């Protein structure tokens, strides 16, 4: 199944979190915090302005982004957990 976000929404896949600390301690799944970074998989066309034209989003497919722990709505697609959120829920684009 493929999702196509509407309006100013983006679809993000959380990046995998490290399961081991720098000192070698293994963190169990139930104790680990959800990662707050992800990769943008799809973007909507944007919001409309007063004239009815779309205002393009500031992020694009493939961008690595930062977001809040509780941002977005979690959905399962083909066994993957994805987040659907508004662009305004994104804090930043991580530049390489």
UniProtKB/Swiss-Prot annotation:
Primary site of residence: cytoplasm
Record flagged with keyword Chaperone: yes
Protein keywords: Chaperone, Cytoplasm
Gene3D superfamilies recorded: GroES chaperonin (2.30.33.40)
Annotated compartments: Cytoplasm
One GO term of the biological process aspect: chaperone cofactor-dependent protein refolding
Family classification: Belongs to the GroES chaperonin family.
Matches recorded under HAMAP family: CH10
Protein's UniProt name: Co-chaperonin GroES
């Amino acid at each position: 199944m493929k999702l196509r976000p509407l309006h100013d929404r983006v679809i993000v896949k959380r990046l995998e979190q490290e399961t081991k600390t720098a000192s070698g301690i293994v963190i169990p799944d139930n104790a680990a915090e959800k990662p707050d970074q992800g990769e943008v998989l799809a973007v909507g066309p944007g919001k409309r302005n007063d004239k009815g034209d779309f205002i393009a989003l500031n992020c694009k497919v493939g961008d690595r982004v930062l977001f809040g722990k509780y941002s977005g709505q979690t959905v399962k697609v083909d066994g993957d957990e994805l987040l659907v959120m508004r662009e305004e829920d994104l804090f930043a684009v991580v530049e390489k």
